[in-house]
Amino acid sequence: MTHTRRALIVGVVALLSANIAAHAQQVRPYQPAFDVTDYAIAIDVPDTGATIHAQATLSVTRTGGGDTLVLDLLDLDVRGITVDGRSVRFVRRPATIAIPLPRKSGRAVVYTVGVDYAGAVTDGLIARADSAGRWTYFGDNWPNRARHWIPSIDHPSDKATVTWRVTAPASKTVVANGKLLSTRVVRDGGEERREWVWREGRRIPVYLMVIAVAPLAQFDFGETACGLAEGQRCVPQSVYTAPEQRATMPGSFARVGEMVQLFSRLVGPFPYEKLAHLQSSTRFGGMENASAIFYADAPFRKGGTPEETIAHETAHQWFGDAVTEREWPHVWLSEGFATYFAALWTRAARGDAVFRTQMAGIRTTILNDSVSVPHRPVIDTLETNLLALLNRNSYEKGGFVLHMLRAQVGDRAFFDAIRSYYAKHRHATAVTDDLRTEMERESKQNLGWFFDQWLRRPGYPEVTATWSYDNPGRRVDVELTQGSRFGAFRFPLVVELVDSAGVTHRSTVDMTTAAEGTVRVQIPSAGRPTSVVLDPDVALLARLVVTER
């Protein structure tokens, strides 16, 4: 998902915390005894209002010794539960349903669990009238809000395929994950309605399972990135907007085909059946739902969604969607990757100079943060409020760590490792050590120190450089000192100077020994330098201060 300002994050946290704080404090780990492999959800969406009626059919594999399946479901009335077609007793608690499962012999036993439920949704499926008074319905599940309308194991570690069977007013369009299988007209009394069936055949986490039901106009790009999707297919892409916004298309979406081409070549095949971009009621700047990205409504009405946001959400189709963080503390594998690959799109589209400017802006954002970066590590195992993970650590610092990792191992090893990481964990889950394994294998380096200092410690290095010109020696003497606020870090630091003749001189300093004091370096210079710069290529996350002695 995308945030563009810290204020947006604070606003979202304030808006949502009341709804999920009680549940965020009690986030259960993955249920090791059960694996939901498929959801089939039939849902009836009303003309107006928030009351739905739905039936969910879950294919559940028992992988351990448990005999009670616990599904997350808030708010709604459960009318009945079946297991393998037979009605069973169940225990309804405020946030869960406990379903006893009959004993079956054998390993990896499969059950078909049916849940009939109804009621007024309060979150997860956002039901509201738009600015023109038209009722719209958009799934908006991150991080664990699917439980407000989908009986599920609402945790990123449990991925499944999903079929949506949505019955809605005939005046509305329905878009969901995956491929459209069919539509047909149905009659409810005298009212004409339409049933839409969508199927996502790749396993995705529940927080990415969504529907859109709204008056939508389609702008079709046709087939893009041909040969670069799974099975060497093309990627059908469309933008869906409110009808009155259709004339503004393609606008900032004009290059979505090129984005998919770039990311496919850098990472691996596009993972889904299509890619839809939708104007929606998501509470985030953008939400990366698998194959159906939802963008905030307001930018469509105020000049267009920023291209950087589109690139960020598109990159999520590989990182976060196809490869999902197994545990929430590793959410940087989603948000940090999307941040950095959006910057790589900038590089491909606008060149190295603009890319460096963007990375410098990302670094400034990190250094200006006073909430998360100075106090918490990127991999934050102590944070219990999931929304608080939407911070500068997960996004900007995570992205900049990838930038430094690329410099550490080199381009070839970096992208080879990214491709193997994606290939091994596509349609599954990963944690940070899975990425480290691939980086070490491709680079032939031990990177434990790198991952520990940048991801498991708060802060960043703070370096002060003082310099003077030695005229008799025709050299510049530079003293480099690390600050003590966050402790000493290990990194190479490039010192660049331009002498009076306009000649550029560079020296790379190993700052490992700076933990014990000051590092001194001498750089030849024919005359007094006109500038002395640290990290001219914007390759290092650090606060850098240069003064002349």
Where are these regions (language model features)?
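Glycine/proline-rich low-complexity spacer/linker segments in large multi-domain proteins
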Residues: 29-31, 116-163, 214-222, 538-549
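A surface-exposed beta-strand-loop module
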Residues: 68-69, 73-133, 188-191, 197, ...
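Beta-strand-rich binding/interaction modules
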Residues: 77-84, 175, 447-448, 462-463, ...
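Amphipathic alpha-helical substructures
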Residues: 349, 391-478, 500
